Amino acid sequence: MGQKVNPTGFRLGIIKDWTSRWYDDSPVISEKIKQDHVIRNYVLARLKREKAGIARIVIERTTKHVKINIYAARPGAVVGRKGEEINNLSQELTRITGKEVKIDVVEVIKPEIEAQLIGDNIAYQLENRVSFRRAMKQAIQQAMRAGAEGIRIRCAGRLGGAEIARAEQYKEGKIPLHTIRANIDYASVTAHTIAGTIGIKVWVYKGEVLVQRIDAIEEDEMKRMKDRRADSKSRPRDPRSKRRRSRTKRA
């Protein structure tokens, strides 16, 4: 199943966290989920013109306000001159949600290994008639130079304007999809070209997480087992237990 399931959903609650971090058991929960979808689409559409490079948008809710964390490769494009862009964005989102909106912009340190940004970059190049092989290979080289342990990119559709659709993929390093502790960043992007739409999927392996914690748990368990064995050997045996064994054998 590791090869089929979405790598992010497969690891949610273990090493990955949700992008909507709030809880509600009221009947209007569906409206809030729909509102999150509207917020994300609006922010992405507005900041796409600024070429801010949005990796992900995390939404947190309380009873009084909505907090939005925007992870961007170019945070200056989100903030704007003297904070004009972020203030206008906050006002528009307040109008949409009906609550006070607080926006925090977080800079993405290594955009070369963010799956969403890689997919967006390849889609942009394909829409501008760049060779798909060249775009894929350049993205792989940049990701491996930036510190990724493995990357796989798959493009499917009318590649190069061909009449028959096909799929091609390139891979470098390792992508352990079955290992739950493996931190794999995944993104799916659609490029709208003259020949039609091209689907782009990106897997980036950034290394293992929880390794130290798992090793510590295993060491503690081994230590406990050794202590139990030592205690059992040091305890004097009850002579009555031998008598009971002999009686059971005679019976």
Swiss-Prot record:
Domain of life, source organism: Bacteria
Boundaries of every KH type-2 domain copy: 39-109
Q: Which keywords belong to this entry? A: Ribonucleoprotein, Ribosomal protein, RNA-binding, rRNA-binding
Q: Which GO terms describe its cellular component?
A: cytosolic small ribosomal subunit
Asked if Transmembrane helix is a keyword of the record, the answer is: no
Q: Which InterPro entries does the record match to this protein?
A: KH_dom, KH_dom-like_a/b, KH_dom_type_2, KH_sf_prok-type, Ribosomal_S3_C_sf, Ribosomal_uS3_bac-typ, Ribosomal_uS3_C, Ribosomal_uS3_CS
The free-text function statement in the UniProt record for this protein reads:
Binds the lower part of the 30S subunit head. Binds mRNA in the 70S ribosome, positioning it for translation.
**HAMAP family per UniProt:** Ribosomal_uS3_B
Please state which protein family the record places this protein in.
Belongs to the universal ribosomal protein uS3 family.
Subunit structure, as described in the record: Part of the 30S ribosomal subunit. Forms a tight complex with proteins S10 and S14.
In its UniProt entry, what is this protein called?
Small ribosomal subunit protein uS3
Organism phylogeny: Bacteria, Pseudomonadati, Chlorobiota, Chlorobiia, Chlorobiales
